[in-house]
Amino acid sequence: FWGVTESQHLVDVINQTDLVESPDGEDKLGQPMINIAYVNEFGNFEIFLLPYFRERTFSGIDGRFRGSPVVNMETASYLSGNGNNHLDAAFRWSHYMDELDWALSYLEGTDREPRLYKNADGTTLKPVYGQARQASLEIQYTISDWLLKAEVLSKHSDLNGNYWASVTGFE
């Protein structure tokens, strides 16, 4: 996975989160993609082309750990005219020097986090997927037996606006 922290995976955005199998967000759904990687002395360079988008899963009416009201996945919609066939793209560069590991990544395409709106019946929620651009940085520094970790992202989402987020930790 992308990222270094264990408590929150801010920058891990290629594969969609599976909230049915793992309400804590640890499990991911597979993602059809084309991945091109190039490795040299300046680091690992990766390009991802994502021709199809998998919607986030939510527990249904009979599912465990469901919210109220229930999310009706059959009513999902997209701001992109191509729906879930929008061609998303991502780039990642990772490298290390001595005790420092880092990675920079960028994703442009369908936002992995839908905005939930009440359906017309008022008893269920409708997931709406906008378009997003996200730039991320992850850093891990080793000091003796300690690992210091950080993830930072800047995101612009059609539905959720602009925001920054970060998480730090240690092992």
Which ranges hold each PLM region?
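Sequence/structural signature of outer-membrane beta-barrel proteins
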Residues: 17-19, 54-56, 111-113, 155-159
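Outer-membrane beta-barrel pore domains and translocons
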Residues: 1, 50-52, 107-109, 142, ...
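Residues on the lipid-exposed face of transmembrane beta-strands in outer-membrane beta-barrel proteins
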Residues: 34-38, 91-95, 104, 137-141, ...
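Long, well-ordered mid-to-C-terminal structural blocks that present hydrophobic/aromatic surfaces
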Residues: 129-171
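Outer-membrane beta-barrel translocator domains and adjoining extracellular loop/strand segments
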Residues: 5-11, 58-64, 114-123, 160-167
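Transmembrane beta-strands of outer-membrane beta-barrel proteins
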Residues: 45-47, 102-104, 148-150
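Outer membrane beta-barrel
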Residues: 1-65, 98
